[in-house]
Every structure is written in C-alpha cells, then in structure tokens.
Amino acid sequence: MNSIDAVVRYSPLRNNLCNLPSAITTMLFSADFNIQQIIVELSWVPHQRAAQRRIAYCGWAGGITKTSSSNPVIEIDRSLASAIDLQENVNVTVNVHIDAVKAITVELEPVTSNDWEIVETHAQVLETYLLNQTRCVYPNQVLVVYPTPQTTARLLVKKIEPEVSTFAQLFNDTEVQIAPKVQKRPSISSVRSDSSGHRIRRVRSSTSTATGRRSVTNNGEVLPSMLRRSITLPNNTYAHVNDSKSGGYKVYCNLNELIPALQNAHFVSVSVLVGPGTPDRTGLTSSKIKQLNDSIDQAAQTQTNAAGSSHPPESSYTETGKVIAELVHDSKSPKGNVGLSELLACSLGIENTVGNLISLEQARKPLIKKPTVLVLHKYTTVSPASLDRVTIKHATEEQKRVQNKKERDTLLTQLMQLLSPLLDSCTFTNCVKLPKIGTLLPNGGLLQFKRIKSGWTTPLGKDNVSLEIGEEILRPESFSPSYDLLPDRKTHVRTQSDQYPTAQENLIESLSKIASGGSLLFGTSGSGKSLVISQVAQIVTNKGHFVKLLNCDKIMSESYNNLRGIFEDIFSEVSWKAPSLLILEDLDSLIPAEQEHSDSSQSRQLSEYFISKLSAQTINRDITILASSKSKESLNSLIFTTHLIEHDFQLRAPDKEARKQILQSYLDTLNVFCSEGELLNNIAVETEGYLPKDLKVLCDRAYHDLISRDILADSDSELDIEESSTPILNGSVGDIANKQSEIENGISGLELTNNSSSTIAVDKHGATIQKDNFDSALSGYIPQSLRGVKLQKSDVRWDDIGGLRDAKSILLETLEWPTKYAPIFSSCPLRLRSGILLYGYPGCGKTLLASAVAAQCGLNFISIKGPEILNKYIGPSEQSVRELFERAQAAKPCILFFDEFDSIAPKRGHDSTGVTDRVVNQMLTQMDGAEGLDGVYVLAATSRPDLIDSALLRPGRLDKSVICDMPDFDDRLDILQSVTRNMNVSKSVNLSSVAGECSGFSGADLQALAYNAYLKAVHEKLTKDESMAMAGEMDDNDDKKRMVECFQFSGNTEKKSLIELKPSDRATVIKKLEHLYQGNGNHAEGETKSKLATTAANSVIITSKDFEDSLSETKQSISQSEKRKLEAIYQQFISGRDGNMPDGTASNEIGARSTLM
C-alpha cells in the first residue's frame, strides 16, 4: 500500500493505537480487512537529529481523523508519543502493513521500579486489557500500558520469539512475560510467594473478524463483536420483512456472514460507532451527549437553587448506548448490511437513517432476577423550575397533590395498555430510550429498572411488572425521537406516489441507477429540478444507499476556507456511510463559469478542490455524485475536464400529456374536479411552454378565482334577501357602499390556501372548476420562461391581409397545422419543416404577413433587424445569434423573424470586415439541418434572395421559399376591401373600378391609395363643419335663454378685457355645453341619442371623388425597369441557378472589396 504524509495530533486514546486519515481508511474498509491485522508504520525526522529518521509501529484503533488543513492528520495518545519521542505537528510518513509475523513469546521489563509497582498492583486488569491496548511490538520498544484511566506504566521490550528485525503481531496465544524490577532485590522465596507478582502472564482473548471490535464485561470476559452497516426500517431493501413481525428490538442480517460466535447467538448488544455525521441524539456513544448532559444538569441546578426546590440530579438518568436486540436471520439482507427495526433504531437515535456503522456484540446473560417495577422518565424541553412557576400558581399544596396523583394514575393506565404488547414479546435493556407515544409521551422517555443499575431481561409479561412515573428528564428538542409508537402517528418516508408527478419517470429512473461517474441535471428555473432530485433521493434511499443533500445556494456567501471545512465534513460523512449518493443542488451558484472581466479565482479554486477530493473518493469508495444547475455552460468548465461528471440530463418543458398529468395532480391536491372531460386537454394545449412551477401557480390562481366567485355569489344572494326585507330607497349610495364594504371584508378575512386542508370548503366532496376560472387565471399571467424575453405583439389580424392566398396557405400549413393537429404530426416519420423564406417585390406584404401569422397560429413572435446582431468585433455577433436562438427556444413555440435577411446573411467571401461571414457561420450552426429546431420556426423576408448565402437555403434550414408576387386584379380588389373594411365608404364607390385602374400597384401602394382618399374625406369634413359653425353663430332666431356667449379670460391681470373665441372653438364649446344643459330625468336616454347623433355627424364618408383625387396623386413605388430586373432575378431563383457560386476568392477588379478572412 502506498505511503502518505500526515501531521501528528495528540488525542486521549489511552492505548498504543492511532486513528488514520480517511485517505487510508477508505481503502481499508473497502478491502474488508480485519482491524486487528492492520499495523501502522510511522517514520519521521526528529527535531534534535535531523539527519536520522526514527521508526515506530502501532495498531489502528478503527477511527477516522478529520482533516483540518491541507495535509492529512494522524492521532495518537500523548503518552505513546512521549515514549517514542514524537512531537505534535511533526510530519510523519505513514505505511500500512497487513500480514505480520505473529509473536509466540514476548519478554518485557518495567522501565522503573514505579512502573513495576503499577504493573504488580493491576496485574489482573493488564492481563485482561493488554490486547485491547496493543496490537504489535518491536525490539527495544517502550511499551505504554494503561491499567486505569489515571495511571500509565512503561515496559521495555527485551526479547521477541521468533526473533524479528521489524515488528511482530500479538494474538490470542501470545505469551507475555514481565520481569519484576524493585528497588531492593527480593529473595526468590518472596517472589514465588507473591501471588500478584508472577513473572509469566499469558494474555488471551477471543477472535474478532473483519471490521471487528472487542468488548469486555465487568468480570473481565472478552466478547466477540463485528461492525456492520445499518439500514433502518421501513426500507424497500427489507420490504420482504413482515411488518407485523418487525416490531420490538430486532436485527435482521444474514447469519452466514457472521463469525461462529455470533451465528449461534439469539441476542446481541447493538451500539452505534460514532463517525462523521452521526446524529447527536445517538445515546452515550457520542461524547456530545455527555457534554450536553453536563451543561443541562448545570443549568437545571442553577434554576433549582434559584427556585428553592430540590430535584434529584438528572445526570443519574442516562440513556444506554448499548441495546439488547433479537438476532433474526434474513438471507436476503445485502452483504455487509443489517436491518434495524424501528423501535431499535429509535432507542439508538438513528431512526430514518441509512449507512451508520453499528457494532454487534454477543449479549451477556440476562438478569437472573427479573425486575418487577419499571420507572418511566418523561423527556421534557422545559426545566422543572420553570414548570413549578407556571402551573397552578394559586392552588394549595393539597390541590396540587390531588391533581398530580390523578394525572399520574391516568397516565400510568394508558401507558400500561400501550406498552403491554412490548412487555409480552420484547427484550428490554435498562435505561433504554423510548419513542414518542402520542400526547402521553410527546417527547419520548427513558425506561429504567428500579433498584437495578444495569443489565437486560427477556420479555417480562404485563402481569408480572408494574409501572411507575419517575422524574422528568430535561433534554433539548433535537434529542427527541421522531418515531411514534402509535400506528396512526407513525411518520414514514413519503413514497414516490405521494409526490407531485414530474412526468419525468424515465429521467428519474436513469438518475436513480447508482453507477460509476457523476451525473448533471440541468434545466431552467422552475423546471422541477428540486422535485426530481427529491424523488431520486427517496428511491436511492429505499435501495439502501446513504443520500447527502446539500443546497449550494445557502453556503455560496461563505469564504473559501469555511467552504473547505464544510466539504471536508461532507466528504468524510459520505465516505463513512458508503455506498452513498452526494447531491449538490444548484452547484453553479458555488462554482460558476469563469467570466472574462470578473474575479473567478474562488470558482477555480473550488473546482480544483472538488476534482482532487471527489475523484479520490469516488475511486476508493462507492460514492456517486448528482449535481444540478441551470445549464451546462453555467458551471465551471474544469468540472468536465475529468470523469467527475460523465452523464448529463436536460430537464425540458413538459409536453401536452405531461402537462395534463401535472395539472390533474395539482387539482387533486386542491380537492377540485373539472366540469368538462376535455377541459384539462384544452388547458394543456393553451399552456404550451409552461414549466411545472407555472402550472402549479396557474392551478392556484384558478382555485382562488373559483373561491372568490363563490364568495361573491353567496354575498350577493344575502344582499338580495336583505333588499327584499328592507328596501333601499332611491338606490342609497351609502347603503350600497356599506354592503360592498361587508363583502370585501368577508373576502379579505378568509384564508385561501393551496392545499387540501384549506380553511374554505366549497363542498365536502370537492369543488368543480370551470373554463372561466382557468381563463381568468391565464389572463395577464406570464410564464417564467417568457419573463425577460422581448416578444413583439402585432395588432394586424389575418383578415387584414388581402391577397397572397398561396403564401398564406403555405404558412398555415407549416406553422398552424403541427400545433392544431399535434397527435397526427407527432407520429409523422419525417422531420417537419421549420424554416420559410419569404421573398418578393418591395411592399408586397412580406413583413405584414409574418407579423400576422404569429397571432393567427397562437405562437410567440420575435422580430430581428440587422443592426441588432451585427458587431464589428470578433465574438459579439456570434454571441448575439446564440442568445437570439436561446430566447426563441425559451419562448417556444415561437416564430423567429429576420427582416431584410440579405443584409444579415449575405454570401460569404464578399465582406471586407468579415462580420456577416461570422454571422452566417453561426446561423448555419444554429440552424443545423440534422438536429432541427424544436418548437422554433424561422421566417426570413427579403427582396433579393440571390444575395443570401446558398448554404442557408438548403433543406433542413430554410426549407421552403415562398414568393410574395405583385397583386393581380383579384388580389388588388381583396387588398382594397381589407384596407377599407374599417372605413365608411360611400355606396357609390366601385372598388372594382378602382382596382382596375391600379395596375402595377403593390400592396403598400394600394394601402397608401386608400389612406390618401381617407385624408381627402377628412379635410372635406373639417371644412364643412367649420362653415356650419359660422352659419350657426349668425342665426338670430335662437332662443335668448339658450344663447351662450363664449369668452376667454386673459392671463394678464393689468388689462381688464375679454377675448372672444374663434368660431371653430366656439362651436366646440357649444356642443359640450349642450350635454350639460339636458335635464336629469332623461339623462341616460339623452346621452345615448347625443352620442349617436355626434357619431353620425362626425363620420367621414369616402366618395368616388376622393378615390379619384388620391389615384391622381399616388404613384407606383416600383418602376417598370426595377420590376423587370426583380422579375428576372426571381425567375432565375425559381428555375434554378447555374451553380457558379463564388468560391470565396477575393476579386482582382478595380474598386472591388476584399475580405479579411
């Protein structure tokens, strides 16, 4: 085995053993070596003599050290270090030896006479514990023995048989001889007569096995033990275990894997081996619990003294760290693992956990005299002194005593009924920790044998034992067990069916397969990564693997040194409990991609640290990594340079069936039913591109709308009843306002929740949700994927476009049909068309057609102009194209429209700067014909298709080229009818004759013709209105009472004069005053008539003369020469080209531009 360098740290081990760093222990655990077989060689250079190296040998204690710096750490006892002259913080080279020579005889001599006196005094203890403290010896070694916790003795190794030059291993039959060393040489007779000073002492102990340990009883008996990995029930690994038989204290394991001494045992002593990540509530095996008890006792004693009461010290009530359990054979138990029943796991403090190492020891004999009285101590989180001050302040002592006795009798009766099945069938260990029992023991408790200090007993029987309530024990809330003994209160781990469906069953199954190499799950925010990860963690846990979940968002603000400490603890824990799955959620927040103009030193350091640590962990131990991020590009690229991340899975937006499934699940949790069978199908179609989070918010909004409408309906019905009994005279505004206030207060006072336990129950059998509720929820809601995406919205309707019948038909076939008839197209074996080129004469409706088709087909629309993506520098233009397609992919289904496409993607080789060449190359990459665009349709419009790079016009990119030709007579008539649809055209106007006179006009020319005619009519209307206003001013027959004199006050205060209004302004004011002059009785009717009269008076009517005048002023925008030129270009484009494409060679002609490429 390769050697490593480590730093020495002192630790109170009280033996000649050491604790090794995880870099070595991971390999030892995986190799399944016997702990007693492992010998550790230490070599170092002392400070005094730097030229000479020293070598020492010791055994391994089975522990793992925590790395506090960049170097591994090895821990040894201070007394051992002093004996071999090894200073703290010295760098040592560590080598591990497995097979060693076994010593037959070892002769030892005390270093001093005081050492001999200690050995002589504690001879029996040394004979019992020597093999527990020492694993090997070597010539001239100063061996330190620890007979008591306070004393040590030093022995010098004088001789080893067989003779060795390095070291020899002690085993059960090794004969250890200790020569006496006294101040005065005693006589031979005195030596022989001293029963405690035998020269020859033999050390024996039972054999232990792989990852085994040794336990010593009070009478010196050494018991065999083994280490095994634990899986607490319930777990799918032990699903074959009958639940009815899994009660009590039981251990399920394959007896064939145990040593013979344990195979024949019916009961074993189970304890938890403390390691990284061991829960703090794990009995006395954790030193933290002892420190916690001391601090609690000190605090309680202080409060007791202050209150003047006397309670017994609670340190006398201490949970046992070793629980006796029944050993049950299970041939299906995974190798190296054992299953722990729920009650046993609770007593050990490791309920609902996987991967803790436990020690199985042969149980001692049970108590001969069974206890007849059991004392139950309840756990409490409030000190007794505080309880005395709170409860029954004004009651007398007699009242207190009577009430306490009554409560105790009731509690004893109920507890005895619940514990009776356990007393009849289970073994019990003294001072065992009990689980919760409903409200009787809300925090658990401790069961103690009365007047018996230790031991265990076989089933007592409910008729042979009585129960007493002892003093309450103060414990923190974190110490309370999570397991409840009552069946209806047991908190099992939620199964996969209890979770919300993600419609990603195949993905979850792939991620749940524990294989070599890490996996990356990436997707946008709200795509359901956390939900998928939680289900994967649940499935992996049920397979018996330990799962460690870390949310990197919560520690992203920590410093680099703190992060290293956090991950050192995590790596140690997953290595200790292997096989493990380490989940790093939102890893990109901790090690983001390096940015060009920002400090990315910490990201690089953490990435390198991850690679170095995790690579070694995953190779040496069965550890798998699962990370999540928003995208692959958001992570530091160093992560992908090694085999740390080998698989990546993208979490895409759910399809229609998945959306329907998710919607149904959320509605079920709300106890809501659909009014129509096809309602969810329709909603699933309308929510294209919605993420699971958006669907949840949508269901919540629809549910709240449903509840709000029911509340308003109930309030309106109550209001109608009150109105019928007490009518509101004249529609009193105050009464109506009061009623409205009551309704609003009623709504605001209700608590609306999004779960099945909502405080508002519309119906015990569930509410019925309507299409209107979903329409209200969809109104104004922007999905998360579209937030921040610039989408263009056009007011142009499909009917507003005249002509272009062939182009409109092709666009609908390409864009609308795949969405409208998705089931038919989903089974199509061919790749669907995703790109269309619109070309034609200027002003023939290419841009108008593209903007209208998005609204017609219900697709999002993104319009791009050339200058938005062109940049003279290398890189930004390509980045703009990539971001553009990413925006479209996020907003899918989406139409990506490029106007004047010839200016963005001309033929390559003719750009002096090379900008458009790079843009074309990037667009070719994005519009790859082999992969296709999922949900993104590309529309390009140009009047010069011959200038576009030919590679973009090949199948798979811009598949179809559609011409927008000059309109013929029918098209011109259709265009004029569409343009004048919202205009008031006189019946005398013949649009057919107008269309006949517009030969050669484009669609834009016809629109300009209609708009010019409308402006002519507007001018005529304004002139007519002004003449009528002036005529009305000179009319003297008007009623003087209704005569209105209009003046305008000047802002100049010094000049007291009035300025008369102009006739046109006077007419406007008079019309406004006429509405105010009308009476209140017929106000509504008069207002309606006035509006109709005003609309009729102000309507603009276009006459034939207006069209004739407009026709005389409007000219064709395309000349005949330009039309013939474009016609030739289009004809050549349709019929085919000669294939003489530019080869990229720069032109040698005078004045020609040369490219930089």
Swiss-Prot record:
GO terms for cellular component: cytosol; peroxisomal membrane. Keywords: ATP-binding, Hydrolase, Membrane, Nucleotide-binding, Peroxisome biogenesis, Protein transport, Transport. Pfam families: AAA (PF00004), AAA_lid_3 (PF17862), PEX-1N (PF09262). Its EC number is 3.6.4.-. It comes from the Eukaryota. PANTHER family: AAA-FAMILY ATPASE, PEROXISOMAL ATPASE PEX1. This is Peroxisomal ATPase PEX1. The lineage of its organism: Eukaryota, Fungi, Dikarya, Ascomycota, Saccharomycotina.
